[in-house]
Curated annotation (Swiss-Prot):
GO terms for biological process: cell wall organization; cellulose catabolic process. Glycans are attached at N178, N375, N384, N452. This is Endoglucanase 23. Pfam families: Glyco_hydro_9 (PF00759). Gene3D superfamilies: 1.50.10.10. It comes from Oryza sativa subsp. japonica (Rice). Its EC number is 3.2.1.4. GO terms for cellular component: extracellular region. Its main location: secreted. Keywords: Carbohydrate metabolism, Cell wall biogenesis/degradation, Cellulose degradation, Glycoprotein, Glycosidase, Hydrolase, Polysaccharide degradation, Secreted, Signal. The keyword Hydrolase applies.
Length: 515
């Protein structure tokens, strides 16, 4: 049914040269007096951004500690169609499918946020964040536990998106998809390696045995990715299952570098440094892009790898610092470089829908790169202007504040934060009566009246950040408009790190651009 159509995933957009009006420059240069006076409760937003993941859980829920109490067990037999155990993990968005590619990216970004900014989190929230990482990595370890294959998806998205039903009720096919030597998927395998390696750093101190298991899994997944090169969506069967939702539009090469970069960061082993140095040009490290997300990792690779050069540890990685600088310059309106689009209200904008994924992921890179630069007193030269860490921090803060309510709509785009936020998000479990209050089954088509209802969702998915407004800063609270009203795990995952930074640095101060 058209009205129940699945989210149309985002194609890569190219950098465009745009003129930014003076009012936008002023908006980015300093917060408004009202915003500065009011401020935001970053601690509350952080807690809720992590809580969101408990509403996305698949599988048997914990007997104690499940705070999204309106959810119940679901998909407990996942993997049965292939004779394996694939219970667990996360539903990617407002549907009931487990897509391995974006789930692994979600885990990577959650882990990276804890690695970089976990010290700024209150202890309870750091523990919740680690739990969110573990829920994903426990599942990812299952996907790589059978020799010769990696399982990359559970659920038939076409059939799933034809129904509006709770995950606890779903009866659509739980088709299992895998990659192998015969049908490679370096993209998913490489991202899985990155996720497991990054997560190993989260648990290194508190659970070294689990951390070692994660790192071993990361090595195995990376070896698979590098030995069997190819994009999973090039295979007709896998393409039918994953596309148009999560096709690999940008190729698998970036995920190979991304996986190697995270294995280098986590293990410090020279093997992975050699891989990065020897294969960077071949695998497109110098690709110029101002995008970072589940499909395109180039900007993230350059920021991550540049750390060793910035810290003075590996001077041969200078080119990655140069590439990272180039990415940063595309975000600075005053720069003469071709740069990203900002809405009149100051939001980073890229066409295609679910725009907040770009806002949160780019904001995370801004803060992470600012941290690296600050540690070595470096700046970024953008030709006609020079920018320092404070400018990057202020720009990221503006984006976070936009999400939390400093925007033309005067509303928060995080469910449960502030006085005004989305009430009708595109999310099956949130929009249907809870299994706890309505234990009777709600079948596939029986959920349609709830989809069409103008009433607020009965189960607020606290912490969910929706796709957000378009280039005109306008947001209609419309469940049917999935491009704007649907939350995803990969919107929230980078935001956790952003908010953690802001908890520790509630007022980053004014950034100054030197001409």
């Amino acid at each position: 049914m058209a009205l129940l159509s699945a989210p149309v995933r985002r194609r890569r957009s190219r950098v465009r040269v745009l003129l930014v009006c003076c009012c936008l420059l002023l908006a980015l240069a300093a917060p408004s007096a009202a915003a500065a006076a009011a401020g935001h409760d970053y601690g509350d937003a952080l807690a809720k951004s992590i809580l969101f993941f408990e509403g996305q859980r698949s599988g048997r829920l914990p007997a104690a500690g499940q705070r999204a109490a309106w959810r119940g067990d679901s998909a407990v037999s996942d993997g049965g169609a292939a004779g394996v155990d694939l219970e667990g993990g996360y539903y990617d968005a407002g549907d009931n499918v487990k897509f391995g590619f974006p789930m692994a990216f979600t885990a990577t970004m959650l882990a990276w946020g804890v690695v970089e900014f976990g010290d700024a989190m209150p202890p309870a929230e750091r523990a919740h964040a680690a739990d969110a990482v573990r829920w994903a990595t426990d599942y990812l370890l299952k996907t790589i536990s059978h020799p010769g294959v990696i399982f990359i998806q559970v659920g038939d998205p076409t059939k799933d998106h034809g129904c509006w039903e709770r995950p606890e009720d779903m009866d659509t096919a739980r088709t299992v998809y895998n990659i192998s030597a015969a049908r490679p998927g370096s993209d998913v395998a490489g991202e899985t390696a990155a996720a497991l390696a990054a997560a190993s750093m989260v648990f290194r101190d508190d659970d070294p045995a689990y951390a070692a298991r994660l790192l071993a899994g990361a090595r195995s997944a990376f070896e698979f990715a590098d030995e069997h090169k190819g994009a999973y969506s090039d295979d007709p069967e896998l393409r039918a299952g994953g596309c148009p939702f999560y096709c690999d539009f940008d190729g698998y090469q970036d995920e190979l570098l991304w996986g190697a970069a995270w294995l280098r960061r986590a293990s410090k082993e020279g093997t992975y440094l050699d891989y990065i140095q020897n294969n960077g040009k071949t695998l497109g490290a110098e690709d110029s892009t101002n995008e970072f997300g589940w499909d395109n990792k180039h900007a993230g690779i350059n920021v991550l790898v540049s750390k060793e050069f910035i810290d003075g540890e590996v001077l041969s990685l200078q080119s990655y610092k140069e590439f990272a600088d180039g990415f940063i310059c595309t975000l600075i309106p005053e720069s003469s470089s071709p740069h990203i689009t900002y809405t009149p209200g100051g939001m980073i904008y890229k066409p295609g829908g679910s725009n907040m994924q770009h806002v949160t992921s780019i904001s995370f890179l801004l803060l992470t790169y600012a941290k690296y630069l600050s540690n070595s007193s470096r700046t970024v030269n953008c030709g006609n202007v020079s920018v320092g860490p404070a400018t990057l921090q202020q720009l990221a803060r503006k984006q976070a504040d936009y999400i939390l309510g400093d925007n033309p709509m005067k509303m928060s785009y995080m469910v449960g934060y502030g006085d005004r936020y989305p009430q009708r998000i595109h999310h099956r479990g949130s929009s249907l009566p809870s299994i706890k209050s309505h234990p009777q089954r709600i079948a596939c088509n029986d959920g349609t009246p709830y989809y069409n209802s103008s009433s607020p969702n009965p189960n607020p998915l606290i912490g969910a950040v929706v796709g957000g407004p378009g280039e005109d800063d306008v947001y209609e609270d419309d469940r049917a408009d999935f491009r704007k009203s649907e939350p995803t795990t990969y919107i929230n995952a980078p935001l956790v790190g952003v908010l953690a930074y802001l908890v520790g640095n509630p007022d980053p101060g004014q950034g100054h651009v030197r001409h």
